């Protein structure tokens, strides 16, 4: 795979270059000491790079979170159904991530009545106008549904990696509609790795190091969780929103959660701040 290198005299020159059409944002892998940018050629849809893991549904996954500048960058934090994201530095000042400042909660009383995607309107899946991936990236980008997350677990090799590059492969246990992924005894060390998170790669690879060398993998960084004006568990746990309400509870929505002890698709309070990852391609949602 071709790699490119561009040098800058200072950080201001780098920021100015980012504003030009020569800057390919989705392909930037990292910025070193404020004067170097390395990036890799990847397939692109509507200006954002994706990885094709050969999934049965044909779903293509974005290589980075919405708001991120690289695959290891945490990106922005979003409440479910909100399209405005916030940096970690803005949490606690511009955004609390609580019912009191959630876009779909009335605050006139203590119950914080849900105003959309509730038992009255019976909407269970985000409309594209409320989909953070679609609103911010356009094209055919949208947030993944629960079925697309479960497909990732069942159709790839995957596992948790520490910021020291220690990878532990996970194994899926459950049905087509539910289950969890837990650590196995299979481990590996990835050289020059410095960000904790979760890795997915094709079953055809013998080891995670082969997939990393081929740059043929999906990585989701452990960006933590926002709530009550704080960002917690950064570098330990990660969470990424799905596009549908949690079963039987309009106050919660599905999300992919992971850590060093396990991973799966669970429910979380809608007001919480999590990462958003875009996908291209459709898959029928699980109905129950």
Task: Put a short name on every predicted segment.
Residues 14-20:
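A short, charged, amphipathic alpha-helix used as a generic interaction element across diverse proteins
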Residues 3-8:
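A short, exposed loop/beta-hairpin motif centered on an aromatic-Gly-Thr core
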Residues 25-288:
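Conserved positions within compact, well-structured domain cores
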């Amino acid at each position: 795979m071709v790699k490119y290198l561009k040098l800058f005299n200072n950080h201001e020159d780098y920021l100015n270059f980012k504003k030009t059409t020569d800057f390919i944002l989705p392909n930037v892998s990292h910025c070193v000491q404020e004067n170097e940018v390395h990036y890799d050629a990847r397939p692109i849809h509507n200006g954002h790079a994706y990885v094709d893991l050969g999934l049965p549904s044909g779903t293509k996954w974005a290589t980075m979170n919405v708001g991120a500048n690289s695959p290891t960058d945490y990106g922005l934090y979003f409440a479910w159904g909100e399209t405005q994201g916030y940096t970690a530095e803005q949490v606690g000042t511009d955004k609390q991530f609580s019912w009191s400042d959630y876009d779909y909660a009335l605050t006139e009383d203590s119950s914080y009545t849900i105003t959309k995607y509730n038992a009255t309107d019976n909407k269970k899946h985000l409309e594209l106008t409320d989909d953070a991936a679609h609103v911010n990236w356009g094209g055919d980008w949208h947030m993944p549904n629960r079925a697309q997350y479960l497909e990732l677990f069942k159709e790839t090799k995957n596992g948790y990696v520490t910021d020291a590059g220690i990878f532990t492969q996970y194994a899926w246990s459950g049905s087509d509609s539910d289950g969890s992924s837990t650590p196995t005894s299979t481990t590996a060390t990835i050289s020059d790795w410095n960000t904790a998170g979760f890795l997915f790669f094709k079953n055809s690879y013998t080891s995670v190091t082969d997939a990393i060398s081929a740059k043929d993998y999906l990585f989701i960084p452990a960006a933590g969780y926002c709530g009550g004006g704080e960002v917690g568990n950064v570098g330990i746990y990660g969470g990424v929103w799905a596009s549908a309400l949690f079963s039987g509870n309009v106050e919660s929505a599905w999300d992919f959660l992971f850590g060093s002890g396990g991973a799966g698709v669970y429910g979380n309070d809608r007001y919480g701040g999590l990462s958003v990852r875009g996908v291209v391609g459709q898959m029928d949602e699980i109905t129950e």
